[in-house]
């Protein structure tokens, strides 16, 4: 199986400006993400940038750099521009890995690509079991429910499914495995072009979840439980310090 990894790496971030270039033990954050994409066995790794400073840093990493526009409203739109510039065949498997996840396990990059290759759905993603009550009721943790064949029924910031009887008890009782969606996607290149041609859907606007556009248009998304639970990405300076400490501990143990 052959697949391409595209890593969107925007320079601007409201919480952490210059995030792709943030130093983590002598390397920019984007370098750590690129290393994991290579370890996953991608046939090609492309970093989609919108700033020359990020492009310069990536050019030294031995992967492709694609300069993209600053007008995109979503990561998928940026991905579509990359697909157009590289003229990928419609059935090419594209894995979108976020540029702010320096600890992403290579195994789950390979897993989501393999899952797409073995399903009729045009898009695949992953989820992990929720084990913490705070996360279960946190709107920043996106929940997903699937049918018996592993296709998404719905993604929501709300707690789904709602365990009416279990949650009515004090303390709340869980009688179901709840799943948190993690933001890694695999697509067929042709489907990415189709996706960006659709208007924004009402559910997508309400939940602020772009994958709901796919379900709105009656297409399928394959969902599987991730082989490894990925550590959190980097959204804030505090997150960055946590990653630095984590990697520092690993280096000191070697």
Curated annotation (Swiss-Prot):
It is found in: Cytoplasm. Pathway: Nucleotide-sugar biosynthesis; CMP-3-deoxy-D-manno-octulosonate biosynthesis; CMP-3-deoxy-D-manno-octulosonate from 3-deoxy-D-manno-octulosonate and CTP: step 1/1; Bacterial outer membrane biogenesis; lipopolysaccharide biosynthesis. It is an enzyme of class 2 (transferase). InterPro entries: Cytidylyl_trans, KdsB, Nucleotide-diphossugar_trans. Its EC number is 2.7.7.38. GO terms for biological process: CMP-keto-3-deoxy-D-manno-octulosonic acid biosynthetic process; lipopolysaccharide biosynthetic process. Activates KDO (a required 8-carbon sugar) for incorporation into bacterial lipopolysaccharide in Gram-negative bacteria. Belongs to the KdsB family. This is 3-deoxy-manno-octulosonate cytidylyltransferase. It comes from Tolumonas auensis (strain DSM 9187 / NBRC 110442 / TA 4).
